[in-house]
Amino acid sequence: MVKAVCVLAGSGDVKGVVHFEQQDEGAVSVEGKIEGLTDGLHGFHIHVFGDNTNGCMSAGSHFNPENKNHGAPGDTDRHVGDLGNVTAEGGVAQFKITDSLISLKGPNSIIGRTAVVHEKADDLGKGGNDESLKTGNAGGRLACGVIGYSP
């Protein structure tokens, strides 16, 4: 089993921890808790760079090695880093996601890349405009962190 962790932080009160686990070549289990969010849906994505020198903006665009459009986690036409939305209630999002496109090893590895929680709901590429097909219209980047191996 391969494990990884990401500590999310931003310029405001949003913070959290996300754990990743992968058995052999199987799907990745993503489990996390993010605090300080407004209630409702928030886009959650893996971005291409593990660079947070300019806050979350230097993390680049969504991790998209196959050069596809933005989409929902279950779509065939989606970025590898498109993990959909997390739902906050009482300011806290606790979630468990299983995804078979991201990996903790190999060409789709997310190790050294940045996880980002966004200010708005991800429209999952169904917004009917160009931005929807790039970002899901998920808005600003509230908090982020680089994903690294863990014991």
Swiss-Prot record:
PROSITE patterns (UniProt xref): SOD_CU_ZN_1, SOD_CU_ZN_2
GO terms for cellular component: cytosol; mitochondrion; nucleus; peroxisome
S-S bridge residues: C56-C144
Keywords: Antioxidant, Copper, Cytoplasm, Disulfide bond, Lipoprotein, Metal-binding, Nucleus, Oxidoreductase, Palmitate, Zinc
Main location: cytoplasm
Binding site for Zn(2+): H62, H70, H79, D82
The record's free-text note on cofactor binding: Binds 1 copper ion per subunit.
Highest taxon of source: Eukaryota
Molecular function GO labels: copper ion binding; superoxide dismutase activity
Catalytic activity: 2 superoxide + 2 H(+) = H2O2 + O2
Subcellular location(s) per record: Cytoplasm; Nucleus
Binding-site list for Cu cation: H45, H47, H62, H118
Keyword hit for Cell division: no
EC number: 1.15.1.1
Cofactor(s) required for function per UniProt: Cu cation; Zn(2+)
UniProt keyword Disulfide bond, yes or no: yes
InterPro entries (UniProt xref): SOD-like_Cu/Zn_dom_sf (IPR036423), SOD_Cu/Zn_/chaperone (IPR024134), SOD_Cu/Zn_BS (IPR018152), SOD_Cu_Zn_dom (IPR001424)
Entries under PANTHER family matching the protein: SUPEROXIDE DISMUTASE CU-ZN -RELATED
Family per similarity comment: Belongs to the Cu-Zn superoxide dismutase family.
Known function: Destroys radicals which are normally produced within the cells and which are toxic to biological systems.
Subunit field text: Homodimer, and heterodimer of Superoxide dismutase [Cu-Zn] A and B.
Record-given protein name: Superoxide dismutase [Cu-Zn] B
Native organism: Xenopus laevis (African clawed frog)
